[in-house]
From Swiss-Prot:
VWFC domain ranges (all copies): 233-287
GO biological process terms on file: cell differentiation; endothelial cell differentiation; endothelial cell migration; hematopoietic stem cell homeostasis; negative regulation of apoptotic process; regulation of BMP signaling pathway
GO molecular-function terms, A-Z: calcium ion binding; heparin binding
TM region positions: none
Record Pfam families: EF-hand_FSTL1, FOLN, Kazal_2, VWF
Task of the protein: Secreted glycoprotein that is involved in various physiological processes, such as angiogenesis, regulation of the immune response, cell proliferation and differentiation. Plays a role in the development of the central nervous system, skeletal system, lungs, and ureter. Promotes endothelial cell survival, migration and differentiation into network structures in an AKT-dependent manner. Also promotes survival of cardiac myocytes. Initiates various signaling cascades by activating different receptors on the cell surface such as DIP2A, TLR4 or BMP receptors.
CDD domains the record matches: EFh_SPARC_FSTL1, KAZAL_FS
Stated name of the protein: Follistatin-related protein 1
Ranges for domain EF-hand: 144-178, 193-228
Glycosylation sites: N144, N175, N180
Organism, scientific name: Homo sapiens
Length: 308
């Protein structure tokens, strides 16, 4: 009995093998002139027609490649098969495992003195000086606003009849309320902010652009009736208001008191030393370009004002 079952089983195996051979020959014949592309293979439909389907299984040979999607594949076939299955375009970036990419996030904004900071410092200085005004008495002469300014100017001038930024800062530091601008959480940045705002005040009335104030320029800067103009930053034929930001690589530039101020971070790259040098040069050129746009805009504005 068992011999009959064995013979029947062998017969069924033989039939299946013959059919498989026939299907393989038929598939080879039908798909002979069909090209399906990477990640696909030709298959025969129930109607006996050729069609292209995603490869069912790749050969397990190990030759890792890194795809353009940042994923490592066992071999080229697996990469193209994944592209077919997901319907996405994936190319071989390079041979071998994908290297971990260092994420470079934009740096924090640079420490800057905005127009609001500058104007607040100026308001506090004027308030302090006005509090020292002494009206003339019956038998004594008081001190008016100009005389008080003259007194401080002479006290902090080093003898050249000009106040530079360090002398101006020493003058402002005489009043703790005036100098106590605390925009940033740490004292180091707030100290830097004070110096930047002093520079911004000097720029307000520095008519000959020597970064020093004569007494007349000093008087104009702190004149209570003087309204500081709102300056904007220029870039690519556009003007940007105080506080506007733009990014270049991993650095951030901020418009402050009419000037672009940028961070000076170096971005990670494959060649660290070369990447840093290149980035620094690019950053310098970029800031120079920003300032050039600003100078052009200022000249155009002055010409337009004269024509009016």
């Amino acid at each position: 009995m068992w011999k009959r079952w064995l013979a029947l089983a062998l017969a069924l195996v033989a039939v299946a093998w013959v059919r498989a051979e026939e299907e393989l020959r038929s598939k080879s014949k039908i798909c002979a002139n069909v090209f399906c592309g990477a990640g696909r293979e030709c298959a025969v439909t129930e109607k006996g027609e050729p069609t292209c389907l995603c490869i069912e299984q790749c050969k397990p040979h190990k030759r890792p490649v890194c795809g353009s999607n940042g994923k490592t594949y066992l071999n080229h076939c697996e990469l193209h098969r994944d592209a077919c299955l997901t319907g996405s375009k994936i190319q071989v970036d390079y041979d071998g495992h994908c290297k971990e990419k260092k994420s470079v996030s934009p740096s924090a904004s640079p420490v800057v003195c905005y127009q609001s900071n500058r104007d607040e410092l100026r308001r506090r200085i004027i308030q302090w000086l006005e509090a020292e005004i002494i009206p003339d008495g019956w038998f004594s002469k008081g001190s008016n606003y100009s005389e008080i300014l003259d007194k401080y100017f002479k006290n902090f001038d080093n003898g050249d009849s000009r106040l530079d930024s360090s002398e101006f800062l020493k003058f402002v530091e005489q009043n703790e309320t005036a100098i106590n601008i605390t925009t940033y959480p740490d004292q180091e940045n707030n100290k830097l902010l004070r110096g930047l705002c002093v520079d911004a005040l000097i720029e307000l009335s520095d008519e000959n652009a020597d970064w020093k104030l004569s007494f007349q320029e000093f008087l104009k800067c702190l004149n209570p009736s003087f309204n500081p103009p709102e300056k904007k930053c220029a870039l690519e034929d556009e003007t940007y208001a105080d506080g506007a930001e733009t990014e270049v690589d991993c650095n951030r530039c901020v418009c402050a008191c009419g000037n672009w101020v940028c961070t000076a971070m170096t971005c990670d790259g494959k060649n660290q030393k070369g990447a840093q040098t290149q980035t620094e040069e690019e950053m310098t050129r970029y800031v120079q370009e920003l300032q050039k746009h600003q100078e052009t805009a200022e000249k155009t504005k002055r010409v337009s004002t004269k024509e009016i």
